[in-house]
Amino acid sequence: LRTENYVTYTPSSSVSPVVSYGSNVVDKQTVYSMAKGLERGGERVLSGINGDYFVMATGDPLGLVVTDGVLRSSASYLNALGFNADGSAVIGTPNLSLMAAFKGNNLKIADINKIRTANGFYLFTDDFASTTKNTQAGVDVILAPNTEGQELKIGTTVSCTVEEVIEAKGATSIPQGKFVMSISNKAGEWLQETIRSLEVGDT
């Protein structure tokens, strides 16, 4: 015998959907703890549902996370659930193009706020965690947005200035309001050389 519980939701001004991920995207918070966090902020939570799969060991979300139009964690091969301004829902496969332009090159960013692999450039924001959580050596570049407080809004370009280039042996701290572009020492040599060519003050 199987029992199913469900909630019937009709969009209205008094009831609206909220996407929550805790204090950062690898927090591994439960639905209950996220609901409590929202209620501490003055919201009244009527219902909640687990919205993504994640890697148990790291908390790395497998899917896309976007709140307030800001890309918190990227993914472009899994279906995603989204909500329009009127509260209605849409389900589909996102088609993200993530690029970094520097030194005359337009280079694909492998992922944003995902555990780094050797597959290319990764970009981290303070939505990810306090550090990059990298466990192997690589190169990390601290980037400051030229417009203070600018975030990774979907469909926009963010211009940054290089603050530091680090030959990192492991995790690098992610400064509040800034970004870390990262590549593994096991990635392609040309990609490593390209990021190592960056200097403090470059944009």
Show the residue positions of the predicted features:
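Zymogen propeptides
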Residues: 1-185, 194
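Signal that preferentially marks extracellular ectodomain short beta-strand elements
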Residues: 188-189
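Loop/turn positions that initiate beta-strands
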Residues: 195-203
